[in-house]
Amino acid sequence: MTTPTTLLCAGAIQDAAGVCAHPGAVVVREGRIVAMGPVDRVTRDIDTRDAATVELYNHLILPGLVNAHAHLDLTNVGPRPFGGSFRDWLIDATSHRPGSPDEITAAVQRGLAMSHDSGTGYLADIAGSTHAVTARINAHLRAKQTGSTPAPAAVPQPVAGVSFIECFGSGDRQTACFERTREHLTAVSALDHTNPTTPIRIGVSPHAPYSCGLDMYRACADLADRHGLPVCTHLAESREELQFLKSADGLFAELLRHYHGPDETFTPQHAHPVDWLEPLFGKANWLLAHCNYVDDPHIETLSRQRNVSVVYCPVASEYFGHRDHRYRDMLDAGVNVCLGTDSILCQPPARNQQQDAYQPMGILAQMRRLFCRDATDPATLLAMATVNGMRALGVDACDATLAPGARANLIAV
C-alpha cells in the first residue's frame, strides 16, 4: 500500500529560511514535507499522480507560527479593561482566575483550540497549576487517538511547545515554595522523564523579580540545569518592577505587604532586573518575557548570552501603556527575539466574530501591529514568529520552515 501524499498548491509559499515561490507547492507525506518550490518544478520532479491535491491559490502557505508567551488557563476570563491602575487590574484578574480542575481544563482546551485556529503551531504556556499541564497533555493524547484536531490549514497538527510550571516565592517563604514547585514538576513527570510521549516539553517559570527572591530563582535554575528544563520569567516588564528591585518600595512592595505581611528580607538590590539575574543566565535556557524597560548596557548583556531569548508581546505591552520597545535594537545586537500574545486579558475583544474570533490567541495580530506601527520588515517579522520562537522554546527551528524533512505544521493565510 502506498503512503498517502498531499500536494498543496498555493498562490505563494514562504518561510524565514529563504523559501519563496509564487505560485508555490508543498508536498506532504506522513506528516513531513518531502518537497517544495514553484508549482511547475515540484510537479515535474515529484510523482504526484496519486496525491490528493489541495488548491489554495488565493492563499499564502507559511509554517505554523510560534506563540512564545501565553496564559492558557485564563482563556475563559476573556479580554478585560485596563483603567490605568495595575494594582486594580491585578486584583481583578486574580479574582477571575479559574480555581477548580474542571474550570482550568476547560480554559486550557479552549485556549488550545483558539490558538490552533489562529495559525499557531507551537506555544509556550505559563501554567498556573499542574492541572493546566495535564489538560494540555491529555488534549494531545486525545487528538492523537482520534485524529480529529480541527485546523484552518490543509495539514492539521496539535499545538506543540512548552508548558512552564509557574511558581512564586519571596522573602522567608522561598525554601518552602521551591519544594512545592519541585513537587509540582514531579507530579507531571518532568524530573524523571516518564511523562507521556507528546510534543509538549515541561519547564519552570519563577514568576517575576517582585514575586520571587533570588534564592528561588537560583534553585529553579539549578533544578532546570540538572534536568534539562527551560526556564521562563517575566523580566523588566514595568517601571514598578525596576523600582522594587532598586529600592524595595513602591507598588509591588505594597502588594507583598498586603498579601504576606511585613518581611524584613525585602531589601534594596540597587540593580536592574537584567543585571540582577545575569549570574544565573549561564544555567539552563532562559526565555525572558517582555523586557519593556532595558537600556544599552542591558541589551549588551543579553547579546552575550547564547542561551537567553526575549519574547515581546506588542499588543499586551500597548495595553498596559508600555511604549518604545527596543526589539529591533535587540535583534541588531544579536539577541534572539520572538513574539507572544501574553494572556487573553490583555487583548482587544473581537470586533467581528467570523473575522476576529481567534485574534486574541494569534501571532498574526502581533505581526500586523508591528508592521503597521513600526513598518518592520515582513521578513524580520516572519523570523520572529517562526524560527526565532522555535529557538526560544528549545525546539528544532527546522520545523518552522518549509524545508524537506520538516514537520508539515502549515497554515494558509
Question: Where do the model's predicted regions map?
Answer:
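Divalent metal-coordination and catalytic microenvironments
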Residues: 11, 26, 31, 58, ...
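Hydrophobic faces of well-ordered beta-strands that scaffold small-molecule active sites
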Residues: 66-68, 123-125, 161-165, 202-206, ...
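Alpha-helical scaffold segments that flank or form the walls of functional sites
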Residues: 78-157, 180-197
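Metal-coordinating catalytic core of metallo-dependent amide/deamination hydrolases
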Residues: 134-284
